[in-house]
Amino acid sequence: ELIGLIPASMREDLLDGIDVKGELQLAAKVEGTYNENSMPAVNAEIKYNKGMISMPEMLPYSVTNFNTHINADIDLNDKSDVYVNYLKANMSNSSFSLSGNIKDVMDKMYCNLKLDATADLDELQSFIPEDIVAKGVLKLNATANVNNYQITNMDFTDAKINGNMQWDNMNVVYCDTINVVADKLNVDLSIPNSTSEDLTNSLAAVNISGTNLDAKVADMIVAGLKDYSITAQVSDVLDENIPMSVYADYSFSRIDASMDDMNFFANNPHGSVAMFMEENNDAT
């Protein structure tokens, strides 16, 4: 009904190829003085329920079950804050949920956010680079405490990011040459690395685990891992001024590999490995 109030000429420009439905509730309080030197402060509450958005030219499926509740304190004379109580949506078999807040949204952008998402990659191939074919179901849970400076400068030394990714029925093909298959792949990421004992300049802790993983490079190399776990401490790879370094503990119940006429296997290998880059980029 609200869209019907928009002049037809404007609807054609703004909503061409877009179909939007749902129930919108808006409440706002405006307080202050409007003049050349001042703008009134606005306290707003936005609720959008039973939403549906269809954009065939951009999205392969309609966005459904779009529900959100947002509070905003907008003060252009000082700082503005946005509070996302919840923002949820589905797209076919994929889903998305976001909550948290963004302080000083017009400038510093101090973000404290929580994300939960499920992506059915079979349905989202149009968003994936053409030289990659990816299948399976990707589940992501993450929390982030970052700001605009850190994001813009890719400097996460003072950021706090924790996340878990679970990839079920993983099947990835790159350039029709490299194929990686796993029944379930788990990746845990933590920034900063709170357990950095073996790497003094460690930025992140990464844990990769799963039950079965098979990889193939053309018809030359075939390899497989069973019951694998890799726990790595990684330096700030985004800082070009810091030589890259990695320290990792690993354990597998079995490794199998073959190349041409050579075959290799090992039962229960485990240990630690370290790589340190010197200033001249030589690895040791």
Predicted segments with their positions:
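Hydrophobic lipid-interacting interfaces of membrane-associated proteins
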Residues: E1-G4, D19-N35, A44-D107, D116-S126, ...
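Short, recurring structural edge motifs at helix starts
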Residues: D13-L14, P129
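Short, solvent-exposed beta-strand/turn "edge" segments of beta-rich domains on protein surfaces
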Residues: G17-D19, V133, M154
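Short glycine/proline/serine/threonine-rich loop/turn segments at secondary-structure transition edges
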Residues: S38, M109, T152-M154
